[in-house]
Amino acid sequence: MTTPGAPPVAGELRGWLTERLALHLGRPVGSLDPRTPLAVYGMDSVCALTLCGDLEDERGLIVPSTLVYDHPTIDALVAYLSVLTAAPVGR
């Protein structure tokens, strides 16, 4: 599900991220509120680092290991990653 008016890339990224987080947290996709801190759902350092690895392996994004702590909700992660993916190569 995407926010009305959201760019297609952000919507696709939100779907991928929500599915990936649901898998790692052992929760149904529909149970994750994008505004709720992921720690509420049991996000820990192992899940956070696994997500960073998924972003690198599957999306080609190099992100800091503190990503989930710096951006603790799905909405915050999507906002950050959308900016990151829009940045020109070789900044």
List where the protein language model places each region.
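Flexible, low-complexity inter-domain linkers and amphipathic docking helices that mediate domain-domain
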Residues: 1-91
